[in-house]
């Protein structure tokens, strides 16, 4: 599902932002 991949991408971006 593309939706699932999109959610994962958002999660990764959010985590990176929080870490940064």
UniProtKB/Swiss-Prot annotation:
GO CC terms: endoplasmic reticulum membrane
Endoplasmic reticulum recorded as keyword: yes
Coiled coil regions, renumbered to chain: none
Alphabetic keyword roster: Endoplasmic reticulum, Membrane, Microsome
Superkingdom in the source lineage: Eukaryota
Location(s) in or outside the cell: Microsome membrane; Endoplasmic reticulum membrane
Function: May have spermidine-binding activity.
Quaternary structure, from the entry: Dimer of 18 kDa and 60 kDa subunit.
Other facts noted in the record for this chain: On the 2D-gel its MW is: 18 kDa.
Name of the protein described by the UniProt record: Putative 18 kDa spermidine-binding protein
Organism per entry: Zea mays (Maize)
Organism taxonomic ancestry: Eukaryota, Viridiplantae, Streptophyta, Embryophyta, Tracheophyta
């Amino acid at each position: 599902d593309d939706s699932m991949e999109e959610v994962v991408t958002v999660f990764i971006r959010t985590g990176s932002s929080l870490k940064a």
